[in-house]
Amino acid sequence: GVCALMAWMTGKYGVSLLLPLLKVIGAVYLGCLLHVLGVYSSLLILLARLNPLHYFKSIVDAQAVAFTSSSSSSTLPISLACAERRLGVSPAITAKVLPIGATINMDGTALYQGVTALFVAQAFGVDLHVVDYLTIISIATLASIGTAGTPGTGLMLLTLTLTAVGLPLEGVALIAGIDRILDMARTTVNVSGDILVSVLIARSEKELDLAIYHDASVGEDIDFTLR
């Protein structure tokens, strides 16, 4: 189905329309990388007074599963194990925060909505006004609050975004061809953010085992069997 859509778009608008898709992939991945390394690191340092390097080292397995599965829900067991056994977050915190985080706190999805909507506008030569930008921001925010943690959900939300600002829905066919690649990046951000929130809450509630968090040997013994 996606192949047929891409073939139709190429025949109608030419191959030159597909080349900028590489820029979209680069923009989404760069945005996700800056968000994780910049925003998440800053939150750990400023709000929790914790070393972000330990955090990133401890969640690498959850990020790997998120990247390959493109599903926050499928990554949930690994996220729980990383948060509890590698970061020292209390099970009482992870049991509440991470399952909820699988459907909300979708920062990567919000970033994806903004970048792809702007790409579609440029690809079809549509000029956006201030109101349109505000609409995109609003929908992206709503997308980050509540989205199913399954692959491809962001693409369905993109249809809503394009419709809201009057952009042609043919743009969905363009994005569909690379959506899986983009989904891998945004899911990694979503999962990383969920674990981060559990650490911040545990830290504020004094439910964080600092001995485990700062353990230099973390990751050497990989056992994801949940207690």
List each model region and its residues:
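Membrane-interfacial loop-to-helix junctions in multi-pass transporters
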Residues: L30-C32, I45-Y55, L87-T94, G125-T135, ...
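Hydrophobic alpha-helical transmembrane segments of membrane transport and translocation systems
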Residues: G154-E220
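Alpha-helical membrane-inserting segments
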Residues: A7, L30, L34-L46, V120, ...
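Helix-loop-helix junctions within the multi-pass membrane cores of secondary transporters/permeases
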Residues: D61-S144, S198, L210-I222
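Interfacial helix-loop-helix linkers and transmembrane-helix boundary segments
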Residues: T10-K23, L44-F56
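Hydrophobic transmembrane alpha-helices of secondary-active transporters
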Residues: G1-Y13, T116, V120
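Hydrophobic transmembrane alpha-helical segments of multi-pass transport and channel proteins
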Residues: Y29-L33, A66-S71, T103-L111, T141-T153, ...
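Entry/N-cap segments of selected transmembrane alpha helices
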Residues: G14-Y40
